[in-house]
């Protein structure tokens, strides 16, 4: 069965499997330094000598390390100890040791007396960036599925395999980290056979860190991955699968050529915007930009054509020659934001700088959605949509590191939906089903027939001894169990349907702490389901605070309300009168905390004497406090808002 499935070929890559002679492998630089300066001639590579492949894996299984070794082995970069995460160019990627943005590199490799062009696309491993992975796979005909010999198959390994499987790509399983003391490649090989139906003898066992057996990976790429099925004599047809923004040269589009040839000076048109551009530069990524005279069908490279805005280089767009229109390639589904958070400048005088920083960063990250927003307490800001929590943290970190912009980031919320009940409301909103990304705009129960909340299908892979604890955690998060599979005698795969708002803040942390860090988690969008949602208001002495309005499930209303009231009590400064902090659903108060008043000792001047004198002074004081409480406006300091609204770890 696997012979039919695992080697299934991409629709545009159904070329015959290339049988390479099993002669000794010889890695060499195809172009000398002088030739590279002179722009290499890419016509040297016929289509049958090109392989486009991607490396996919769970976070931390050694994708970027394997990419470094492949770059060294093909002479693309010099062999030094400094080669760590060569393709991870962002500071945030190097600090966190993760890949955020997919990167491309063209490798020149001699094997069996022939010279091959191998285009490698390194992809992120974290669930939030699976959109980046699916985009990268569209430019490939095969993948290296890397699995850690110690940890075995993890949740993201499964998710990434099915992305490649659905794209009908050849899959080469690679078991990495065989140098580790606890490595058990035989066990992992059996897991791969059981879960993915790939014979264990097809697995390549390597150590990317030490470079052990890595050359056999390159041999497998040539032998097992088919060349792209393209036509160079046809008019140009190129897919834009990624883009970055350079403030001096404009948009740099990463393209995969399906048909034809592109060279400097060509006039090209975008199928999406119908705008025409003149090509200023084309080239390959080696892994840095290396200009070439031309790019030919089957090759992957970059193109600069004077586009001023990344929205002009739409991901999934087709580029073609002016006066030679072609049938556009099927694009990608645009990434759907799963998490929304308010972003405000710490000081309103920084608004314009932050606006400019967000605009520049969203040029490079088209999956972030931006809506203008304002708050009485925090001033003008934005409501940004992200693919997940890590995506949000990385975006915030990049704002600070690359643009020196410090921001207030509010607790993330998820996009709810409401089905409106009356024709009048439907006419007002212009649709029956409205999406709510700001809790303050949540419609009343009387206006809707039902509320809907987003749900995701989550996969948890855990050692069997933690199964009970993890199942209890999932049930506490309102999850419904769908499936349970034993991968081997020590590990189990659980599938649950989760409400997205239950996992968005701290589920991952709780899962890791319950399983001593051994469990892994991945999720995919599963649409919407009806839910009993309520809008919870926070009142201070009876006055509603708009910024603290939240949407919660009815079951969780008390817990969340109590938590917000407690945090607000810690943050609010004491006044001369008592402050009642209440959480209310509709007219019903469900939680309350009290900030005690400062008390002046009005009896200090009384030395003994009649008790009625003391009672009179105390009565006058309490009347004054009542009056003050009625007319007193509670000023909530900005710091208090920040403490309450900011993401609360492990709360």
Curated annotation (Swiss-Prot):
Q: Where mainly found? A: mitochondrion
A Gene Ontology molecular-function term? GTPase activity
Q: Provide the binding site for GTP.
A: 57-64, 122-126, 176-179
* Signal sequence segment: none
Membrane disposition:
Peripheral membrane protein
| Protein EC | 3.6.5.-
**Transit peptide per record:** 1-31
Which top class of enzyme applies to this chain? hydrolase
One biological process term from GO is: translation
Domain (tr-type G) spans: 48-229
Q: Which UniProt keywords apply?
A: GTP-binding, Hydrolase, Membrane, Mitochondrion, Mitochondrion inner membrane, Nucleotide-binding, Protein biosynthesis, Transit peptide
Q: Show the InterPro entries listed in the entry.
A: EF-4, EFG_III/V, EFG_V-like, EFTu-like_2, G_TR_CS, LepA_C_sf, LepA_CTD, LepA_IV
The record's catalysed reaction(s) read: GTP + H2O = GDP + phosphate + H(+)
User: Cellular location of this protein?
Assistant: Mitochondrion inner membrane
- Write down the Pfam families for this protein, in alphabetical order: EFG_C (PF00679), GTP_EFTU (PF00009), GTP_EFTU_D2 (PF03144), LepA_C (PF06421)
State a GO cellular component annotated for this protein. Answer: mitochondrial matrix
PROSITE patterns assigned to the protein according to its UniProt record, in alphabetical order? G_TR_1 (PS00301), G_TR_2 (PS51722)
State the source organism's domain of life: Eukaryota
NCBIfam families named in the record: lepA, small_GTP
Q: Which family does it belong to?
A: Belongs to the TRAFAC class translation factor GTPase superfamily. Classic translation factor GTPase family. LepA subfamily.
Instruction: Report the protein's function.
Output: Promotes mitochondrial protein synthesis. May act as a fidelity factor of the translation reaction, by catalyzing a one-codon backward translocation of tRNAs on improperly translocated ribosomes. Binds to mitochondrial ribosomes in a GTP-dependent manner.
Protein name from the UniProt record: Translation factor Guf1, mitochondrial
